[in-house]
From Swiss-Prot:
Keywords: Cell inner membrane, Cell membrane, Hydrolase, Membrane, Metal-binding, Metalloprotease, Protease, Transmembrane, Transmembrane helix, Zinc. Its EC number is 3.4.24.-. One of its GO terms (cellular component) is plasma membrane. This is Protease HtpX homolog. GO terms for biological process: proteolysis. It is found in: Cell inner membrane. Pfam families: Peptidase_M48 (PF01435). The keyword Cell wall biogenesis/degradation does not apply. One of its GO terms (molecular function) is zinc ion binding. The chain crosses the membrane at residues 6-26, 28-48, 140-160, 178-198. The lineage of its organism: Bacteria, Pseudomonadati, Campylobacterota, Epsilonproteobacteria, Campylobacterales. Belongs to the peptidase M48B family. The active site is at E131. It comes from Campylobacter curvus (strain 525.92). The gene is htpX. Its cofactor is Zn(2+).
Amino acid sequence: MEIFKTCFLMVVLMLLFVFVGGYVGGQQGMIIAFLVALGMNFFSYFFSDKLVLKRYNAVEVSKKNAKGLYAIVRRLSQNAGLPMPKVYIIPERAPNAFATGRNPSHAAVAVTEGLLNLLNENEIEGVLAHELSHVRHYDILTGSIAAVMAGAIAMLANFAKFGAASGSNRNTQKGNAAIMLIIALIMPLAATIIQMAISREREYKADKGAALLTGHPEWLESALNKLENYSNSYTMQNASPQSAHMFIINPFGDIKNTLSTLFRTHPSTSDRIAELKKIGMQLKNR
């Protein structure tokens, strides 16, 4: 299913580029846009993880300089039957975490310094189990490509604005200019919808996977509660909207108002905690 989602995202990206390229530059623009889209798809598949890690200044660590963290990841990976991923720490005081990579053999998990300082060992294990569940379900490739795609859509919106402006200046393509302006306005919404489509359900799925992997859903439950309380006071300083869906909680804080809730990339933390409580009851009744 995740492979299908990944292919779908790549096709959508290509079609968007070709469509906008055709309006801006005709047949030649379509060809150029097609080649650019091919290049971006190739880049997204092989390098999206590196781009995201670099975006957040993540530093790779080993068992020598992060013994406790490394040991938790190794133990969970073995229990999940996964290859050992690379482990990164992000120099950021806001607590958060994400996983990235194109498959379990090329995966990485990253946590912020703030998360390590805020949570106890059991809670950290719950968070890392959540991230490794993303790895096991192949969510990481889809999420990484979606992050690059959201950035590409933002770039396309700028191209569309340029096309609208140039068309209106020539006074010969007013219809095309109007269409391009509409595209420029709806593309940011399209990027958000794409992030929503791949994020909400997979967070519940990863929460459940973490609960089953550790056997202690209360660990992740406690971690999410702390993360939400802290994130509403301290949001990530260099967080990017294009990659917000990758984190275990929204790096911009939990959204409360009704309108914004419709476009949130994460389920509400209270709903996630409620689901974890249900899983906990099911485990006790076995």
